Design a protein with these regions (language model features):
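An interfacial alpha-helical scaffold signature
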Residues: 1-236, 240-253
């Protein structure tokens, strides 16, 4: 079987044994994790079949089988990166995009050398920080009914115009909710990144870059918001995660 290297993340090369050596944490297909070093950086990699993530070499597996395999690989990628996040609390870790591969260790080292300054800058920026994801949703039909009840004058127009005005009023209310949530949480964060609102009921999908020391304050802020908007908004709070939303490095394979 011809192999290549799957690249998970970049961590500090401080001359010590990598955090996964004693735990024997494995990567995709339980392959041993290893590091490829360049100067003070170390890429965490594992060996995979060269046909993986290559549609031209993926064989005769059905689309359903390929999808299941991809989901399993993504889950393992996330598990490895979360492990690295927890084991690199002080030195930090830089997650790289899912599916990044290289022919061999030499090519991995070449990637580290080519974008060293970017990687070093990102790793320094993310040191001691995690990503926390905040999603807020509401019952849109209920909100529209409330708006109509509070503004009976809107019901005097024709149905098309009434519908348009109701949704415009709902958007104003959504923006106020989102602003209030952000005002409460942003003092505890170093940065934030807007995510797509994946459903009509979702009013906010935002990732925050938070120092570990301030994570308890962020948690308290979420508790406050949950109590304040109980019965009006439902929240989904995800994290801590590696700072996926705050890394934007273009690495060609």
């Amino acid at each position: 079987m011809q192999e290549k290297k799957f690249i998970y993340a970049v961590i500090e090369n401080n001359g010590e044994s990598p955090p996964f050596v004693e735990s024997r944490t494995g990567g995709i297909d339980a392959a041993p994790l290893e590091t490829v070093c360049y100067r003070d950086l170390a890429a965490v990699v594992s060996a995979i079949d060269a046909s993986r993530f290559d549609p031209d070499l993926s064989g005769e597996a059905s689309s359903a089988q390929k999808e299941e395999s991809l989901k399993a690989d993504l889950l393992k990628y996330q598990q490895v990166n979360f492990f690295l996040l927890e084991q690199s609390r002080r030195s930090g870790m830089l997650p790289l995009r899912f599916g990044l591969t290289a022919r061999d260790k030499e090519e991995v080292e070449g990637v580290l050398e080519r974008v060293y300054i970017q990687l070093r800058t990102y790793l320094d920026r993310l040191k001691g920080k995690v990503e926390l994801v905040v999603q807020a949703s509401w019952d849109l039909p209920k909100i529209l009914q409330e708006i109509a009840g509070d503004n009976p004058e809107l019901m005097g127009a024709d149905r098309v115009q009434t519908g348009r005005m109701l949704f415009e009023a709902a958007e104003v209310r959504r923006e106020k909710f989102a602003a209030a949530i952000h005002d409460k949480l942003s003092p505890f964060a170093r940065d934030f990144s807007e995510g797509p609102r994946k459903a009509e009921a979702m009013i906010l999908n935002r990732s925050y870059l938070v120092e570990r020391e301030k994570e308890p304050l962020f948690d308290e802020g979420m508790d406050f918001l949950g109590t304040k908007y109980e019965g009006h908004l439902s929240f989904r709070y995800i994290g801590p995660l590696p700072a996926y939303s705050f890394v934007n490095i273009e690495l060609t394979q």
